[in-house]
Amino acid sequence: MAVPLPNDSSNAAFSWFTEYQRSCILENGVVPEWFHGIISRKAAEEMLMCKPAGYFLIRVSESRVGYTLSYRAEDRCRHFMINVLPDNQFMIVGEKTVYCSLHDLVAFHRRCPILPYNELLTVACEQGGKTNYVELLFPQKKDVSHRQVEWISSSTATNTLQSNISEENQTSQLQNNSTSHPGRLYPSLETEVSALNIQSTDQPTKPVPKPRTVFASKTPAEETPPQLPPRMRLPSRLQTSTEDRSQGLMPVIPDRQQITPNTPNEGRTQQKNQQQKPVVMSLVHIKKKLKKKRSEDHTYEEIAGGLFQKDATSALESINTNVEGLVENDYQELAEHPISDGIPKSSDRNLPVEYRHPPPFAPGY
């Protein structure tokens, strides 16, 4: 059974919640949307009547120790009391199921309806802008803010006192300097120099920057064109004989050993002349070579034709002599039925040389 609260119910509910139930509501440091703190029954109905059926909230009861579940039905708002058991468990009055936390109770009745009306909890009713749970869940915020304000005010007061003291010290020093020489109309250089020296010793010295070297840019008129480097002399090749050059066996190449020109213009003209000469000479030599090749080909054909005729006649004579010797010394036994082996017979002497038997001393026989 729930214990009723005394006459001063708001303070009793506040002390009970802060001592026993604060850690049960917070889940991972987050306040659930359905928790609305200490609010009255009328305020809960005003919040739920403008919502559709199934909206709900849980509030701290004002008249007893425990919570109250308020939700919107189809035609009205219904309220169910939630008892807090000694082992810090929760149970709706009229039911037998026990829940370990209010989060479990809400999750269960989102799936299973509340008896005897068979109505489910759908959406948590959010607070409209008034946070009724701040005083319950964060009661030390006010004290902390007051302490912070006191500490800030004390720190500002000490800072102002220190600044006033420093200003008074500076003014007193100036007054002492002025009173030390009351008869002077103009300031003395000695006192000002001493004051500057004192200030320079108090302030940290800054490193003096090193002087920078300035490079003057040259105008384009002053810039002279770079001189061409002298060419390396290549080792002289073996001089070819004049006979080879005349016959066209060796190409005529001008000697590369030349005196280096004194000026870049002379060197360029010499390079152009050297590039043009070999081209002309090479064309002349190509024509000479073509003429010589044609004459040599005709001579080679005449010589080769005579030699070939001589070799052919000698070969035919040797073949004829060998064939005659073979016919005289060759004896063959003829079978009753002659068999054609595809080899020409010795009797066929009228056959050409290609179809006759080769001589015994012929190569490859």
UniProtKB/Swiss-Prot annotation:
Pfam families: SH2 (PF00017). Keywords: SH2 domain. Residues 199-278, 335-365 are annotated as: Disordered. GO terms for biological process: signal transduction. Residues 34-125 form the SH2 domain. Gene3D superfamilies: SH2 domain. GO terms for cellular component: cytoplasm. Residues 257-277 have a biased composition (Polar residues). May be an adapter protein involved in tyrosine kinase signaling. This is Hematopoietic SH2 domain-containing protein homolog. It comes from Danio rerio.
